[in-house]
Amino acid sequence: MNESLNNSSRLAVLCSICLAICFFFYKFGFRILDPTNIGFIFRMGGDLATSYFGWAFLRESPWSFPFGKLTGYFSPIGSYSTIVGANPLLTIPLKLLSPLLPSDFQYFGWSLLACYCLQAYFGYRLMRLITSNIIQQVLGVGFFLLSPPFLWRITQGHEGPSAQWIILAAFTIYFENYSSIKNKNVILFWSLLIVGAFAIFTYFCAMVMAFAIAFSLGHVVFTPHYRLKLIGSVALYPLLVLATFASLGFLSSGISYQWDLLSYTTYSLNLNSFINPLRWSWILPGLPYRLGQMEGFNYLGLGIIILVGCSIIYLVWQRPKFNNLKYLAPFLITLLLFFIYAISNRVTWGNVVLFRYPLPEPVLRMANILRCSGRFGYPLFYAILYGALFCFVAIRRKTLSIVLMCTCLLIQIADIHKLLYDPVFHEAGPVVSPLKSAAWQSIGRNFDKIIIDPPFISAITDEDDYKYFLLYAYKNHLAIDTGFPGRLPLKRMQIYKDELQESLGSGKLDPKAIYLFADPIDAETLKIFHKWDQCALVDGYIVYTTDGRFLDGSNSLEVEPLTFREFLKKYEGNTILIAAREYLASALLPEEVKKYLLEKGSKLPALGFAGSYVGVFSRGQKVVEKISAKRDVKVEMRGQVAPSGRQVIADQDIELYSAGVPFGNKASIKIAGVEHSRGRGGLNIVAIDRDGNILASIFFGVNNPNRTTLCYTSK
């Protein structure tokens, strides 16, 4: 009997892991497991790229305590690999092997595969507690693998939030010892999970510790035999977190929290989040939500929604009796506290604030330590799913239960199929860096650091191009003053910014540094720096060194500051292509620009917050434009003729695309299939002549929509 049970368990585990592997390869393909393939990291960018550079610069940094100190990254302040998002459980052992590893080594593909497999394994462990039927167990695992919050996070490639198996592991420990402590090592298991969760993702650490404390307090009341140990564990868990916190550099990084700017209310859980698919459902429409609440994405999926509905009907119809419900009370109280924290003190349904209540400033500061409060909806999601599965497997007719589970699983697959496959990972090739000039090779040999003005930015000339300079700095052993730690030492950053501005104004510049200036040039820098004629334009980037070794007379720079109105006037006789992206509000446009656009019949001044807009203006006239607050917009002009059929725009095909924040957050301007948009927040604009030649590619930013600089290579 026991041997048969063990064989059945092994088969269920094997089927679960195989199912996870199949889903993984369907979504990502095989190339992601190539440890030298970093192309998909650069294609994705964002948190995945940040985590990669945390690992890369750790390889270049000396060993230290606290562990994971990064010296060349975010220079001269530095950071820690854990704060940047690199998993110390993997990066610290791999650092020991670093001399044997190739320069482009990445472990993220295998880490994401592990997330799939562990999601399946702990899903099986939970299913095993409620049914011995192997088919029901594997079907239940399928639902855990098809959980939209898990798939959405893993689509982003961010290994921290993707490790949602940690929540399932916490559920497993809790429910395997639900009414009595069956494993004497349960405190050890909780401790290991807490430390591991902290190393992987601090949000999950907070969740696991809360469940561990709830478990201990519950059994202090209901299990007197273990009372003394359990009381001790309540004190032990916070001490473990504090020790891990210190050993991984969180106490040494000078972090200051942007509580007033990035309040935890912004990234909260919307009350409609469990039924709001955003743009990921094939069947249900997306519902409104407030800016930032994508962090609380917890859509159940239509299959799970039906599963939950049927479970409610079962509970009402059958009214089953549940034993030992008192042991569930600490678990439910913990979930309630998570829910209260997740929705924040500003409670919303859709884009409507239902009510809000005040919190003292110290409480807000504490809450902002884990400011993406919507993520605390994940345990609620899995509790809802597990509860529904519990009811389904309790149906006495197993055949009916299995048929219903299969049906719901197929509906779930159909509904969220867009989350199951990601072409970015299948199509990503090698890294194509914009740094092509031979001059960059000399920089790597002759300089020690790269200084960017303004520092700590992600867009120097084009959106997210900082990652190419980080890669360049890593491969050439240079320090660089950019990067994106998860938490920012704001005071130290401001001190460095002030020192940099002072050195630029006084002319006392570092002879071992190459200076890069963001385009458009910072307004203050434009005033105080007086050596623009000694700068060079290298691959479109504004470069300065104290000895001018890159200036051979062919790439010396000319800078022309322009307001928005001056730009429109300068290129009015040509064609101007516009695509909006991210948070642009028409209220920020200067009045003279609004007046000019309205005279042309443009709807741009009516663009709403985070809306979508594209427009074509040629020879002082509006040709075509599209604007929407509800979807993305696109204009295609094939051949030479505009949509009106009357006016020749250029001898090239033109494609314009804009997606507001809720619809993809993107701006694109393609001419003859080549991207020329900066992709930045604000108005991205390209001016072209009759032959389709690029006259200027600039943007007017969100914070200052009335100023830009045109940079030319003087002839």
What is each model feature region?
Residues 1-34, 233-238, 316-334:
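Start-transfer (signal-anchor) and selected internal transmembrane alpha helices
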Residues 416-559:
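Extracytoplasmic
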